[in-house]
Amino acid sequence: MSIGGDWQKRRVGNLEGLGGIDRRTFVKLSGMSAAALIFGLGPFTEEAVARTRFSDYPFSLGVASGDPLPSGVVLWTRLAPNPLAEDGKGGMPPLKVPVYWEVAEDERFRKVVRRGKGFARPELAHSLHVEVRGLKPAREYFYRFRAGSELSPTGRTKTAPVPGASVGALAFAFASCQMYEHGYYTAYRRMSEEDLDLVVHLGDYIYEYGPNEYVAQSGNVRTHNSPEIFTLSEYRNRHALYKTDEDLQAAHAAFPWIVTWDDHEVENNYADEVSEVDSEPDQDPVVFLGRRAAAYQAYYEHMPLRRASVPTGPDMLLYRRVTYGDLAEFNVLDTRQYRDDQATSDPERQDPSRTITGEEQEQWLFNGLATSRAHWKVLAQQVFFAKREPDEGESYSMDAWDGYLGSRNRVLKFIQDQRIANPIVLTGDVHNNWAAELKANFDHPNSETLGVEFIGTSITSGGDGAATPGPDQQAILEENPHIRFFNGQRGYVRCRLRPELWRTDYRVLPYVKEPGAPIYTKASFAVEAGRPGLQVVSETAVPSRASSLIESDAKRIRAQESADERRRGGRR
């Protein structure tokens, strides 16, 4: 079957006759959203309420909370008695279903402080996003849902302190890149056992590939449940597949999350309205906008996000700011939706007009940094920020900030000119742990250090990994003296901060091919307030399965190119 024919058979909506329209027309054609136009979502008019009897346990995808404020938090669940139903509806009827929720100060719900009723509606895959208000700041709470006679698991959450309030400490973890096929989510189980206030997810929550298209060096251990995803039902099912994992559910239930996306929530290396260069039908921008609308809607449906992030067709507001008293302010960035296309040459990447954030988001970031009263100004974002000069014969990553020098230079110049104190950049994407100092001029190692960047490894993506640098990574460390640390194992990064000190611990697993791995701290770094730069606290030898399984950038790119080749071969 041809690629085009396969797409035509699997898509939900009808794209015929839409060629040549622009984004504005695309969105206006739908009174509700572009997703409704392309993927067959009509406005909900059925007022009947389903009798709440389920074919199986409806809370199969767990519970979650997110985007904490001093007075409240978002509570999330999705009713899905058959979570992997092929139509993407989770085994639910096309009717709204009442869901009751309650929040208590104790785990046994003896002191309930808030309760209410919402409706899980089919147009949002029977997901529920409850924006609870009236809670006390900096408090632990417990929550649960009820639908019919079924009770959800209990979740724990915590509100943020009041902006400007004196806060003595904060503990959080950040994570990214959880390719389902590459390993087990033991890292999330270990994370759920930590004493944390918050989790920050930096993207690649799902991967779009078909079964065994993207193969880890250590081999795949689980299998995606459908070919590459394009339609709303398929994106819904992929999110559901990932969320059926009990370790991931445990981490969601244990802490509030702040989430942002990278590329694989839609498609590898997409840039704004530009699809990855391949032979798929979404090379047509109109088709890609339809795909993006489906992906964005499914993302919203499965994340604890506020109404401000409800997508309008192929557009969704995800960048936002979360404040923890006077201690930390998180500027959560979106480096996918507004970026210029990736550069194809060195002169192009050096073009000062190029942007990875878009002008509006960049100005929003600058305004936030300039007015923040927090001790620590955090940029929670996706791709490598510091310069990473490659080894001889390799090229810069055009997908990272190295491919958008204008954007990076403007951010660093603003930090330097405005004397922004204590900026910290948090990064995912590259499937390895790194730590770097941010220089006023990366070409001059003795130039002023303006801040630091902590780059976190993947939860599973890339397979088992290795504890020590290989030749490629060693060359990068030698070429880039501002990059101070490397580790290639899986895990997450834990950060514990006080007004005077930020401490980062790289938490790693010896393997992910099998469940149940122990967790170790490979290295710890400290940053003193007012003294930007990395201080090594400790670095320890930890167990590792092999030294040859590091997924370098080159290997990762080759593996994803191989995935494209397998996909094309499977569709001939």
Task: Mark where each language-model region is.
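Metal-dependent phosphoester/phosphodiester hydrolase catalytic core
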Residues: 2-572
